Design a protein with these regions (language model features):
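Membrane-anchoring hydrophobic helices of lipid-metabolizing enzymes
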Residues: 2-131, 167-169, 176, 251
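Short Gly/charged-rich anion-binding patches and loops
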Residues: 24, 58, 115, 139, ...
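Non-catalytic C-terminal accessory region of glycerolipid acyltransferases
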Residues: 32, 51, 146-147, 170, ...
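Short hydrophobic/aromatic residue motifs in ordered secondary structure
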Residues: 36, 136, 299-300
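Catalytic core of membrane glycerolipid acyltransferases/transacylases, capturing the structured
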Residues: 81-84, 91-92, 123-183, 198, ...
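A conditional alpha-helix N-cap/helix-loop micro-motif detector
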Residues: 107-111, 134, 161, 182-186, ...
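General small-molecule cofactor/ligand-binding pocket signal
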Residues: 110, 179, 260
């Protein structure tokens, strides 16, 4: 386990102008439409592809690890495949704005839910969804719409949560809220517990460590050690709520939403808490790796994801 901050942190990169850019882009899409905005957004992403060496190297590292871990030679990275991953990200940004604007109808959703979890959306007590930055986590909004009046609370690390909520209000996203959770202090835990008791659901990404460090657990991911946040699993244990996994992958212009039950409860004793959390993190990493094979170019963590300093690599 570790509490050390991660160099070249993803959040430090995203915070720079992220809200202003999202506000401008959301306005432009509303006024000009997706068809007009798409070429501009692709040009912006192309710029970051050409001049963002760290992001290119990170995408190449991911593709190389995926190819070696899976044994699938066709997934080996190339200049073309790395470029296509960036273009997939541009497409996902446009899809994100469509979701926020309510333009993703049920006819574009394909729900894979063998346990019939989405029927629980209207239950008396909420549950926790753990997603990732593979595919489009913002489909939570469309999922909330399926539950009628169910409110979905997306837990984020950005300092601009309230500003984003104003954008959501302007787009008519009444059932979706962003909540900043920099740390799990008593006030935050009380608020989240109350939301669950009101039947609201929580969603959080399980693949990114908060900006100011935070407790992490190492897991084998695509054949290499990587640091994952303990936060989602600590949250689930403290709130004593069911935990489910959520993946949303785009295939043939439709969004395939995969809902998987993960644990009825995350329980630990003081002596074995770290071991229980580490086991949950590894299970999550295994499921995430399997989903990467279904949409290999929809991995949108463009920063050094693998911790090369982990002693297990020596």
């Amino acid at each position: 386990m570790s509490e050390a901050p991660i160099p070249s942190h993803w959040a430090a990169q995203r915070e720079r102008g992220s809200f202003a850019l999202m506000r401008l882009t959301a306005w432009a899409v509303r006024v000009l439409g997706r068809r007009t905005m798409a070429p501009l957004l692709y040009l912006i992403v192309l710029y970051f592809y050409l001049f963002g060496r760290s992001a290119r190297d990170s995408a190449r590292q991911y593709q190389g690890n995926l190819a070696r871990w899976s044994g699938r030679v066709e997934l080996q990275p190339s200049t073309r495949s790395v470029y296509r991953q960036f273009m997939s990200f541009a497409e996902a940004l446009l899809d994100k704005l469509d979701v926020w604007s309510g333009r993703v109808g049920r006819e574009r959703l394909v729900i894979h839910d063998q346990a019939n979890l989405h029927a629980s959306l209207a239950g008396p007590r909420g549950q926790l969804l753990v997603g990732s930055h593979l595919g489009n986590l913002d489909i939570c909004r469309a999922l909330a719409e399926m539950g009628g009046e169910v409110r979905m609370n997306v837990l984020v690390h950005t300092r601009h949560a309230e500003q984003f909520n104003r954008l959501l209000d302007q787009s008519g996203a009444d059932n979706l809220r962003l909540i900043q959770v920099s740390e799990l202090d008593p006030a935050t835990m009380l608020q989240l517990s109350q939301r669950l008791e009101r039947g609201e659901w929580l969603a959080i990404a399980g693949d990114r460590v908060p900006l100011h460090g935070g407790r992490t657990a190492m897991a084998d991911f695509l054949g290499q050690p990587a640091a994952f946040p303990q936060g989602p699993w600590l949250l689930a244990g403290l709130l004593e709520c069911p935990v489910n996994l959520l993946f949303c992958l785009k295939q043939d212009e439709r969004f395939h939403v995969h809902l998987e039950p993960f644990a009825e409860r995350i329980r630990w004793r003081r002596a074995d808490r770290d071991a229980v959390i580490a086991q949950a993190v590894q299970r999550y990493a295994d499921r995430l790796a399997a989903r990467c094979l279904e949409a290999p170019l929809q991995w949108f963590n463009f920063y050094p994801f693998w911790n090369t300093q982990d002693p297990r690599r020596d």
